[in-house]
Amino acid sequence: MSQSTAFRATALVVEDDPMQREMICVLLEESNYNVIQCESAEAAELVLDKFSNSLALMITDVSLAGRMNGVELAHIATSRNPQLDVVVTSGRALPEPLPRGAKFWSKPWAALDVLREAEWAQTRSATQH
């Protein structure tokens, strides 16, 4: 009798504030996600180069360390994986339009928002794998 391993989705969290990043990561890990975390869009772009098709969810802040912002990163991510669930967060107005299908969460958002999005993205991703 073979044992099957439950599907475990992977999320990319891009946030330069360590406390915010850690909170999101803990919530996602509690939702049975593998989590990759980055402080900058440039670091996240390297992750997307290797893993964009295996990601279920990306949550990014708009204001990040480095030269690229989270909206620009969202455009890159969705161009590499149109099925990726992308959430962009900010306490300010967006500097430019989001890519089609991306969601915007105004800060402060609730932990329940992360948990709901994680469940939705994981269910969607599991049906594609």
Where are these regions (language model features)?
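Short amphipathic alpha-helix used as the core "switch/output" element in two-component signaling
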Residues: 45, 71-83
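Active-site residues of response regulator receiver
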Residues: 61-62
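Short loop/helix-cap segments at secondary-structure boundaries that form the rim of catalytic
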Residues: 92-102
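Non-catalytic signal-transmission and effector/linker regions of two-component phosphorelay proteins
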Residues: 1-12, 18-19, 25, 54, ...
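Acidic, metal-coordinating helix/loop segments flanking the phosphotransfer/catalytic sites
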Residues: 37-57
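Two-component/phosphorelay signaling modules centered on CheY-like receiver
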Residues: 18-37
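Acidic catalytic/metal-coordinating carboxylates
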Residues: 40, 68-73
